[in-house]
């Protein structure tokens, strides 16, 4: 399992490594090429999770470490079977 995590989520460091291959990246640097084979994303509002980012990817779950969710295209995720939460 591959998980990409926004590097501004310091409390997660070390928590998922026993279970997954984890990559910590600045939110603005999370690109379609990087998420292509990722199973999950843990993001903040800087990462726009829409068709441009997710099309053709293996992502099945997006967790947002934010109060709002306006950076997640819920309609697109629903059509693709991508679960998300914030």
Cite the ranges covered by each PLM segment:
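N-terminal glycine-/charge-rich "phosphate-binding" loop or analogous flexible N-terminal tail
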Residues: 1-38
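Phosphate/diphosphate ligand-binding glycine-rich loop within oxidoreductases
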Residues: 40-86
